């Protein structure tokens, strides 16, 4: 964007993950978890916990791969997000934030594979695919990247992107916002 570039006196690039099918980057980690799992680990389905975006991603992915699911949504979840999960045929269970991960552990004992919202190697690798895309896009523009601003919630996004980008641009400053 010329106005932004001129304002900051540098090239500024944006990566809009809101245009992903599930509405956020969260599907990357969920998909990578599924693709990296043994069939036996998925035979009873998946479980996830979230206030919104990860629940949508887990619902989306379980629908694509035709997996049973138990999606724990916080009682405070936005009704719009709840409806998106329902549209992906999610088995939604309401929980409070205090007991949410306890509920997921119970589902794990029933044989459901837990897809963590921001932690675990497969989740971080999924987020890392975003870093690979950014690196390829920057290289295709025959330029480099000195700084990147990445939003921080649970830390999975910045960890995945940062790890990937450091492989291509060791000098990069990774800034959490």
Annotate each predicted stretch with a short phrase.
Residues 1-177:
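PLP-dependent amino-acid enzyme catalytic core
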